[in-house]
Structures are given as structure tokens and as C-alpha cells.
């Protein structure tokens, strides 16, 4: 399962690279990637815990983007 979470985290990273790191909601990200919502949420948690992802509350959803080094 850890490997699967890691691959999904890579898919999320690639998604942001391909979309110029434009902020996206969790709902849109889950709809865009061919992964289960649970796996997407676990991968987002991994990236956020590692300090690679910035999450902000957006109504009933969350908006996120990659943290880029300054």
C-alpha cells in the first residue's frame, strides 16, 4: 500500500507540473486522476506531511498547490 500511495503522490506532483502548479480543489484533483479518492487523500497527506503541498480550506472543499523552494 505504501508503494501505491507513493506512486499516486507522484501522479499528483506530475499533475501540478503539467498544470503550472495552478491551485486545484481536492474534488477536481480526484476527478482528474485515475485513482480512488481514498488513495488521493492518503497521497495528499503524505505530500503535505513532507512539506511539499500547501492546503487551504475552500468552503466545503480544499484547494492545494505544491510548495516551491524560494
Predicted regions span which residues?
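Short, cationic-aromatic polyanion-contact patches
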Residues: 2-9, 57-70
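Short amphipathic alpha-helical interface segments
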Residues: 5-27, 31
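A local structural micro-motif
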Residues: 24, 38, 55-56
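Short loop/turn and capping residues at structural boundaries
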Residues: 27, 41, 58-59
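Short secondary-structure boundary/hinge segments and terminal tails
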Residues: 34, 48, 65-66
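Short amphipathic alpha-helical interaction segments
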Residues: 35-46
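A short, conserved structural fragment
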Residues: 48-58
Amino acid at each position: 500500500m505504501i508503494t501505491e500511495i507513493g506512486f499516486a503522490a507522484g501522479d499528483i506532483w506530475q499533475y501540478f507540473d503539467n498544470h503550472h502548479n495552478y491551485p486545484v480543489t481536492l474534488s477536481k484533483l480526484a476527478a482528474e486522476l485515475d485513482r480512488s479518492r481514498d488513495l488521493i487523500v492518503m497521497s495528499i497527506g503524505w505530500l503535505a506531511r513532507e512539506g511539499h503541498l500547501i492546503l487551504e480550506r475552500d468552503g466545503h472543499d480544499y484547494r492545494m498547490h505544491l510548495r516551491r523552494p524560494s
